[in-house]
Amino acid sequence: MIEKMKVVHIVAAASEKTALLDRLRALGIVHFGEKASADQRHLERFTELSKMEMLLQEYTGQEPEKKLLSDKEFEVFYKDLAACMDRHKALQEQKTAVHAAAERLSEWGAFSPAELRSLGDQGLDIHIYRTDKKTAAALAADPDVRVIRLAPVGKMPTLASIGPLPAPYPVTEFPIPEKGLEELNREWEDCDRGIRVCEAELHDAARHLPSIHDQMLKTQNAAEYSAVSNTSQSQDGLVWLTGYIPAAEVEGFKKAAAQAHWAWAMEDPAADDDKVPTKVKYNKVTRLMIPVFDILGVVPGYREYDISFWFLGFFTLFFAMIIGDAGYGCLFLLAALVMTLKNKKASTAVQLLWLLSIATIVWGALTGTWFGLEQAMDVPLLKSLVIPTFANYPAHFGVESTTQQNTIMKFCFILGTVQLSLACVMNIRRKLGEKDLSWLADLGWLAAIDALYFVVLYLVIGQQVNLMPVACVVIAGFLLVVLFGGMSPDKTFGQGLKAGLGDAFTVFLNTISAFGNIMSYIRLFAVGMASLAIAQSFNNMAFGFKGPLVIAAILILLIGHGLNIVMGLLSVVVHGVRLNLLEFSGQLGMEWAGIAYDPFKKRDKIKK
């Protein structure tokens, strides 16, 4: 359920601004929609602390500190660590540059640039060149040029001359470096020693990661406090703030306001207010969807539906059909059991894993799929659990494979039709309550979708359907959508009719899209069959190995089924989630563009 919100305006004396902010943060129920930027110093410090935390994660291993550093102690630690990180970074960059210079110089061998420069001071302007064999021969034959032949460098003739060579000759001069190879190697070793010293300090500093996390939390809280402070407005000795509070918290706010002597005003959000936050109230069942919504980062709009219950139901079924293997479900169940026993309590995510595991086992048992093994049907107990027309090995039940495939596809289309029809019914119910005449358009969509289901069966499965009444229902639904789709409580009948007729072509395209939406549920069948085929392929590969090669067979099974599980989980995200977020939500008119309710309070966890 999406909780109702109230807009609240809070006014206090400007001299009481700090007390106002402190009390509001302690109250922890007011959401501020458009906050100003936090103070730059807090943002910069949080960024630096985040960099420290990320770097020190690479140096963990020692037992973490048991007592957090005090703020004063942490400041000393912070400055030392920042200096160490800067020194470590500079040494790494220097080491990389020295290594690159040494690589470039290595083919020239060990020599002393200082000695070459000293010769220059004595009047010997030595230049070193590389060139091709033809040019080298020409230079040697030129009586006006004096060159000394050196050992080839990089398989190219190398020459030395007193003074620069004449311009016409195509040669590449070797610039005398500042440091020789020996000096560079010594510098590289010095950098390496310095880096090891820094890394020892970083290993020791990693013990204080809990203190860094604590300071990150404090800094984030300070940043939010400053943002709310900067958001407040003041004039004539007064300071005020505007935010949102859940309707269920109104009495608690009134009590706090009376104690603090605030002036306040409260009202319902305006119809065009798109900054109203969404607070979803979950029950014991729907809260299982929280991990999925958190991963996807989606929040329903304030005026949209809370579809957590329906999302959970369909998502569970889609997950089971896409994974499709009871053996994999048993592995998921085992993982859920291990995590529950390890933590001595099942988190919301683990509880969801329990549900998905059981659903996968049930679906796999009904289709007779156990690690893709056809031999599983030789076990009487497992065979007795199978619905013959759903069986992935229909020959064991005297069912033709075409009949089995058509049955599964038909089941997928039924799921799609039911889910999309449910969306229409939900829209009708809401609009009837709002006295919105456009509910008739949703009734038209309901009729059209249910009729299009038979068109899908006719085209995909080849089922005999009387198309005349189906076409009549689709046309009737289309007309209802065109005539009443533009209606709304703030329009006259004529205005709504005009708007609906103006969208007639769009409605025509949307009707075709509705047909495609039902068709898209065939992905549940296709992905499930692909997963089964992959499992069977790896099984056949593994069973072909005999004798000492059994170890290779085991590796093939582990890698193959592991890969299949990973691909199945990715398919759940790509296909199972899509059907809920696009097809179902699209029919509901949901955009998932809500703003999560995020009240101003002192946090005990770092906000991502």
Give the ranges of each region predicted by the language model.
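Long, charged N-terminal accessory/stalk domains
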Residues: M1-W310, M339, A346-V350
